């Protein structure tokens, strides 16, 4: 490709409404342009990257034995009513009627459509397992689209759905897809982690998120320093401290604390180690518990994990914090003065709290705290459970190393769905015993457009994007200095251009009448991994300057060796 025949569309200035670096660079590099809120046109440079991501995904799906299909973007509302999601999905589901007043939706996902296909096309266990995928535009009416294509309303997604007659078959396909996803993101040279994730409202038995590590990520992910353990912070287990509870050294004391309504105020005013404080959080209880509220206790410097807490039998779902009025009506004190001593409601303490001694907590009297609290002596040890978020330095749940926490961008998610949709849509086959059997399903998604943004978040510097070779818009940029006045420079540039193209290398020849500084800046901005500079002075010594975008160092390569050098260094 020649720049004179191409739409480069680079910008010198960063648009004011672009928040994260990927959004800024995608606009400046001429990859996308905003049409409306959450809607973007992909320009030639951006589309080249998007197609490369898409092709890698498609190749690995084919290698994994998945079968490609294409389903309608517009879906009849009847299917969503049948599955129960018409009322559950919320305002993100774009609903409309056709000229016949028949209701439809613009598909955000395709579980209903694929399940409907299978129930009409597959009748016997002998036809299974089957795994279908598509790469298609989706639409979700996000209330606040932001971060460019990272959270847009319209996006390209690879969604796959597998169907089985046994858990063993589902697990085998799930493992195959896990391996395929790992291969996909490895081929793109992304620093990622496959993390255990909560199944959430979708349900099912297993779930993994594929997270690209980036400081701008929206998710906290946890991984071990010495093993392959990794999990979403909501799911990461906080193991009990190795050392048991120390013996009591202090007497129980009731202290006036009129101006200490938070842990921070208590620590500051009484010079207490925060590790010796406990905070008490009250949430709504289930009817079966026979109580209105449940107390959850975590160490003063730890945070409650609401997903873990919601799984406690006495805790009502969804987890709901008690209001101050409700707390005062039952306890007789405000939220800043709560603690376990003489607390006449169910209590659940975190594992770390169970191992504490001589700690401080509210006295259930406004403006008072107990200091020197010890389990058994002062209050019976209640139910113990893992109800907190892990912190850096915690022991890894597998016993290998300690935990690190980094931000991640979710680019893929795989679920074992079970029979949620097949039961709702009555998708059955004749089993081996001749009786009808409900299918079990797996669901596997990759946000193709989000992968592009995530790759930029992980690969950039002050000059622009640094693409991994596998998804770069071009492999090589040729910058001929003053080619419109130097026949020799033009001849060498054209010869190298044609030779590289013949070898299947994607080349951008900058044949614009521009200053060298502009040419260099544009190629660095759009992130071409390999650049060669051809000038009369270097040609006098039969050399060409080569620069690797990631490493940044310049090398002088013999003109006669430049083709072989590039072929050896380009990773395809």
Swiss-Prot record:
Name the chemical reaction catalysed here.
tRNA(Pro) + L-proline + ATP = L-prolyl-tRNA(Pro) + AMP + diphosphate
Q: What is its EC number?
A: 6.1.1.15
* Keywords of this entry: Aminoacyl-tRNA synthetase, ATP-binding, Cytoplasm, Ligase, Nucleotide-binding, Protein biosynthesis
Gene Ontology process terms (BP) = prolyl-tRNA aminoacylation
Q: Which InterPro entries match?
A: aa-tRNA-synt_IIb (IPR002314), aa-tRNA-synth_II (IPR006195), aa-tRNA-synth_II/BPL/LPL (IPR045864), Anticodon-bd (IPR004154), Anticodon-bd_dom_sf (IPR036621), Pro-tRNA-ligase_IIa (IPR002316), Pro-tRNA-synth_IIa_bac-type (IPR004500), Pro-tRNA-Synthase_IIa_type1 (IPR023717)
Q: Look at the named UniProt entry and state the broad enzyme category this protein falls under.
A: ligase
Q: Which GO terms describe its cellular component?
A: cytosol
Q: What is its main location?
A: cytoplasm
Q: Which GO terms describe its molecular function?
A: aminoacyl-tRNA deacylase activity; ATP binding; proline-tRNA ligase activity
Which Pfam families would you find in this protein's record? HGTP_anticodon (PF03129), tRNA-synt_2b (PF00587), tRNA_edit (PF04073)
The protein's location, in the record's own words, is: Cytoplasm
Q: Which family does it belong to?
A: Belongs to the class-II aminoacyl-tRNA synthetase family. ProS type 1 subfamily.
What is the stated purpose of this protein? Answer: Catalyzes the attachment of proline to tRNA(Pro) in a two-step reaction: proline is first activated by ATP to form Pro-AMP and then transferred to the acceptor end of tRNA(Pro). As ProRS can inadvertently accommodate and process non-cognate amino acids such as alanine and cysteine, to avoid such errors it has two additional distinct editing activities against alanine. One activity is designated as 'pretransfer' editing and involves the tRNA(Pro)-independent hydrolysis of activated Ala-AMP.
Please give the NCBIfam families that the UniProt record associates with this protein. PRK09194.1, proS_fam_II
Notes concerning its domains = Consists of three domains: the N-terminal catalytic domain, the editing domain and the C-terminal anticodon-binding domain.
Whom does it interact with, and what assembly results? Homodimer.
Q: Under what name is this protein listed?
A: Proline--tRNA ligase
What is the organism field in this record? Pectobacterium atrosepticum (strain SCRI 1043 / ATCC BAA-672) (Erwinia carotovora subsp. atroseptica)
